[in-house]
C-alpha cells in the first residue's frame, strides 16, 4: 500500500478529530451535557407533570440538548473506531481493511460537515417547525402556474430533507396553477433551513400557455415564518379578529363541500389573513389557523425589530418581503441566487427540490 494513500487517510482522520474537538467547544458540549443530566432528573420527578407547561418545555429542551450531546458523543466514538481501524490496516497491510477505513473517513467527513453547517443556525426560532406562504404575482395564468411549480419544489425539498410537509390551504388559479398556498413543514430545524427562502422568485421561460411560444417573465412571492410554541407569549386580542367559515374547495371527497369546515381569520390591526381547510373538523382548522396567526404576528414583530437594527448597519443586505432573491431562466438552463451569486444549470433538479447549494450559501453568508 503506497505511503501517499496512507498519509492521505491519516491526515483526513486527524483533521476530522480536530474539527470535532472545535465543534465541542463551539457548541458548548460540556455545559449541554451537564444540563441534559439536570433536565433528565427533573423529568424523572413524578410531580413534574403537575405543571404541564413546564414539563413540556423541559421535554423540548431535552430534545434540543440530546441533538447536540448525542451527536457529538457518537461522533467522537466513531472517530476513535475509525482511527483504530486505520492503524490495523496500516499494520497488517490489508487492502479490504484500508478500503473500509477510506469509506469511514468519507462518511465522517459528511457528518462533521453537516454539524458545522448546523452551527449557522443562530436564530432562536431556527429549531422550530415553520409555515411557507406562496403567493402568485401579477401575470394571470402564467404567474399561477409558477406558484404551483414553487409549491411542488418546496414539497420535494421537504421530502429530500425528511421533513413532513402538509398543505394547509390552497386556492386554485382560474385556468391553471394556484393563486396561493400555505404549507406547514414539520422537522428538526425546518425554519432554520427554509427561512432564507423568503422573497420574490422570478421565472423566465417560453410559456406553454402562449401559442406563439413567447418568452414570459413571472413572479411569485414566498414568505417563511416559524411555528411558535406555547413557551413564547404572543398576545392576541379576540376583539381584533374577524373569523369567517366557508366550504372547503379542492380534493377531499363528497364530504368536503357539505359543511363550512374551512376557517379564515383576519387580524384587523395588521391586515394579516390566515386560512386553513385541510381538516374536516372546523374546530381543528380553527386551532391550526390561530397557530398560524400567532406565528405570523411573531415573525412580523421580529422583522420589525430586525429592520430597526438594520438601519444602524447600512452594510447589511436587504432581505425584506419585496426583495427579489432568485431568478429561474429555464430556456438558458440557469437558476441564480441574486444574493449569493450561486448558480446552477440543472434547472430540472432545482425545481425537483435540489436547493441545498442555494440554502447553504445563503446561511453561510448570513443573508
From Swiss-Prot:
Methylated by PrmC. Methylation increases the termination efficiency of RF2. It is found in: Cytoplasm. The modification N5-methylglutamine is found at residue 254. GO terms for molecular function: translation release factor activity, codon specific. One of its GO terms (cellular component) is cytoplasm. InterPro entries: PCRF, Pep_chain_release_fac_I, Pep_chain_release_fac_I_sf, PrfB. It holds the Pfam family PCRF. Keywords: Cytoplasm, Methylation, Protein biosynthesis. PANTHER family: CLASS I PEPTIDE CHAIN RELEASE FACTOR, PEPTIDE CHAIN RELEASE FACTOR 2. NCBIfam families: prfB. Peptide chain release factor 2 directs the termination of translation in response to the peptide chain termination codons UGA and UAA. Belongs to the prokaryotic/mitochondrial release factor family. This is Peptide chain release factor 2. It comes from Burkholderia cenocepacia (strain ATCC BAA-245 / DSM 16553 / LMG 16656 / NCTC 13227 / J2315 / CF5610) (Burkholderia cepacia (strain J2315)). The gene is prfB.
Amino acid at each position: 500500500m503506497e505511503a501517499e494513500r496512507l498519509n492521505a487517510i491519516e491526515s483526513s482522520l486527524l483533521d476530522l478529530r480536530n474539527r470535532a474537538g472545535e465543534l465541542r467547544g463551539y457548541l458548548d458540549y460540556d455545559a449541554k451535557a451537564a444540563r441534559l443530566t439536570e433536565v433528565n432528573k427533573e423529568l424523572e420527578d413524578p410531580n413534574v407533570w403537575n405543571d404541564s407547561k413546564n414539563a413540556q418545555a423541559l421535554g423540548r429542551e431535552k430534545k434540543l440538548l440530546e441533538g447536540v450531546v448525542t451527536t457529538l458523543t457518537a461522533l467522537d466514538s466513531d472517530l476513535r473506531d475509525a482511527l483504530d481501524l486505520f492503524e490495523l490496516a496500516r499494520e497488517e497491510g490489508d487492502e479490504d481493511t484500508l478500503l473500509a477505513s477510506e469509506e469511514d473517513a468519507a462518511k465522517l467527513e459528511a457528518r462533521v460537515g453537516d454539524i458545522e453547517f448546523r452551527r449557522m443556525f443562530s436564530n432562536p426560532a431556527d429549531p422550530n417547525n415553520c409555515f411557507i406562504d406562496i403567493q402568485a404575482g401579477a401575470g394571470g395564468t402564467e404567474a399561477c402556474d409558477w406558484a404551483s411549480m414553487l409549491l411542488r419544489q418546496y414539497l420535494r425539498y421537504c421530502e429530500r430533507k425528511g421533513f413532513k410537509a402538509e398543505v394547509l390551504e390552497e386556492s386554485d388559479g382560474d385556468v391553471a396553477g394556484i393563486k396561493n398556498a400555505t404549507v406547514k413543514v414539520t422537522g428538526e430545524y425546518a425554519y432554520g433551513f427554509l427561512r432564507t427562502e423568503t422573497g420574490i422568485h422570478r421565472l423566465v421561460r417560453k410559456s406553454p400557455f402562449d401559442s406563439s411560444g413567447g418568452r414570459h417573465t413571472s413572479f411569485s412571492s414566498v414568505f417563511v415564518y416559524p411555528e411558535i410554541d406555547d413557551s413564547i407569549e404572543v398576545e392576541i386580542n379576540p376583539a381584533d379578529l374577524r373569523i369567517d367559515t366557508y366550504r372547503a374547495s379542492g380534493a377531499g371527497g363528497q364530504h368536503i363541500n357539505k359543511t363550512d369546515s374551512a376557517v379564515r381569520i383576519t387580524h384587523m390591526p395588521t391586515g394579516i389573513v390566515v386560512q386553513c381547510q385541510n381538516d374536516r373538523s372546523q374546530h381543528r382548522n380553527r386551532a391550526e389557523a390561530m397557530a398560524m396567526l400567532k406565528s405570523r404576528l411573531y415573525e412580523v414583530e421580529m422583522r420589525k425589530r430586525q429592520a430597526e437594527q438594520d438601519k444602524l448597519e447600512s452594510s447589511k443586505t436587504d432581505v425584506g418581503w419585496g426583495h427579489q432573491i432568485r431568478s429561474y431562466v429555464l430556456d438558458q438552463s440557469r437558476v441564480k441566487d441574486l444574493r449569493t451569486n450561486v448558480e446552477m444549470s440543472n434547472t430540472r433538479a432545482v425545481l425537483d427540490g435540489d436547493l441545498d447549494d442555494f440554502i447553504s450559501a445563503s446561511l453561510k453568508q448570513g443573508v
